[in-house]
Design a protein with these regions (language model features):
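Short histidine-centered beta-strand/loop micro-motifs
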Residues: 32-36, 84, 309, 327-333
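Acidic, glycine-rich loop-and-beta core segments that form the ion-binding/anion-interacting portion
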Residues: 194-263
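Short acidic-glycine-tyrosine-enriched beta hairpin
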Residues: 233-243, 248-253, 320, 350-370
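Ligand-binding loop in jelly-roll beta-barrel domains
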Residues: 76-81, 88-91, 116-122, 126-131, ...
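A short beta-strand-loop-beta hairpin characteristic of the jelly-roll/cupin
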Residues: 52-69, 135-136, 218-237, 331-334, ...
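Conserved short histidine dyad/triad with adjacent acidic residue
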Residues: 301-304, 316-334
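Transition-metal
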Residues: 1-198, 274-294, 317
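C-terminal, non-catalytic macromolecule-binding modules
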Residues: 256-307
Length: 393
């Protein structure tokens, strides 16, 4: 481990969360999933929960023993809806983490909100048609949906008086019996339509019915269903990306994506979950304001590399497409990098060494390395690294 190889093969870790699909990630990794176990996420990074394995000439090591990366790189296959989430700013995370430590709340407690001192901005890049909730609807759209749903007549008037914060605070703090009284008649109308296949993914009713089937138990309606109507429903086409900054409520609904985020576990949930919801903490950090979703098309910085820039200093995503038998592509890693090979076969040349990375495999490149990539088959890769402004800091 003393001599730098420059570039290493790494092996990530699969997370078998219940919401994951059963086919996409196993096929990508070349694994047989005869038991149809959910393969939700494939993690690449040094996160202490599931660090990647670093494969070296002298043996295999935990990547976390070699480097503490500021980012975590993932492949996601979303088959069932994820919880509504909000992440704190970096400053808020540091304060709240210290507070919960002083209160001696165990890190593994289900009531622990802040697992570390970091923020958790996220970038999702669609590998398929990808659906998500992202921020509150613009005012005219939210008013229109509150008018269109008969059960929300009282919420329409409340929103006119109290605005976004008042509306969200009302439904998140509402007694469960009142939640059931409002939502159950709505669900009684729309769930049969969903089961008949007459609803469509661009409709709020589609996702509300799906959420009810997934999350409602013992006659209790999940209050996150309100947010399906309040938030923007966003469809990403393959190749489009979207950025989730601190405070923006969001939930992944369906599809496959690459996800790149700051290395943090700080999540405040707002429904569509059986896990702990701390409404008081959620309301501290959620941005209750209209948001026009901004899809990121990326920008080509060379004939082969497309970069997706965000305000986050922790990471930057690049997509690389290599033509079969094409010219070598040269890079200098001024920060740590992880490459994931989505398709084809790619050869890395660094420090007079060669590493071949096949479909579903990944490589770690150390900072300060000059290296080139070449593909005989044609390949498509994604690189997790640092933005130009923070490289080398």
């Amino acid at each position: 481990m003393q001599v730098k190889q420059g570039v290493y093969a790494i092996k990530g870790v699969v997370q078998h969360y219940d919401w994951g699909g059963t086919d996409f990630i196993p096929a990508l990794l070349g694994q047989v999933n005869a038991a149809k176990k959910p393969y939700a996420e494939y993690w690449m990074g040094s996160h202490p929960k599931s660090p990647s394995e670093l494969i070296t000439e002298t043996g295999n090591w935990s990547l976390a023993d070699r480097v503490q990366l500021p980012f975590l790189f993932k492949v996601l296959d979303v088959s069932d809806m994820l919880s509504i989430q909000v992440h704190p700013t970096k400053a808020a995370a540091a304060l709240e983490f210290a507070r919960e430590n002083s209160e001696k709340i165990p890190l593994d407690s289900p009531k622990r909100n802040y697992k570390d001192e970091n923020h958790k901005p996220e970038l999702a890049y669609a590998l398929s048609e990808f659906w998500l909730l992202h921020g509150f609807k613009p005012e005219h759209e939210l008013l229109a949906i509150l008018r269109a749903v008969p059960e929300f007549a009282g919420l329409h008037d409340w929103f006119l008086r109290e605005g976004y914060l008042g509306l969200y605070k009302k439904v998140m703090g509402m007694p469960q019996d009142e939640v059931n009284t409002l939502l159950q008649p709505l669900l009684d109308r729309i769930v049969p339509l969903y089961e008949k296949g007459v609803l469509h993914r661009q409709e709020e009713d589609y996702w509300a019915a799906r959420a009810a089937i997934t999350f409602n138990r013992n006659g209790q309606c999940d209050r996150g269903i309100f947010s399906v109507y309040f938030f923007n429903i966003v469809k990403l086409e393959p190749g489009e990306a979207i950025f989730q900054d601190a405070g923006i409520p969001h939930a992944y609904l369906f599809g496959q994506c690459m996800e790149l985020m700051a290395n943090s576990d700080n999540v405040l949930r707002g429904g569509l979950t059986s896990k702990h919801i701390d409404v008081k903490e959620l309301m501290k950090h959620v941005r209750c304001e209209p948001l026009e979703p901004k899809k990121l098309p990326g920008a080509w910085i060379s004939g082969a590399e497309k970069v997706f820039e965000t305000p986050a200093p922790d990471f930057q995503l690049s997509e690389l497409r290599l033509n079969a038998g094409g010219e070598e592509q040269a890079f200098i890693s001024q920060g740590p990098e992880i490459w994931f090979n989505l398709s084809g076969s790619t050869r890395f040349f660094c420090q007079e060494r060669e590493l071949t990375v096949q479909k579903g495999e990944a490589a770690y490149v150390e900072p300060g390395m000059a290296y080139t990539l070449l593909s005989a088959t044609g390949s498509r890769l994604f690189k997790a690294g640092l933005p130009h402004s923070t490289k080398g800091e």
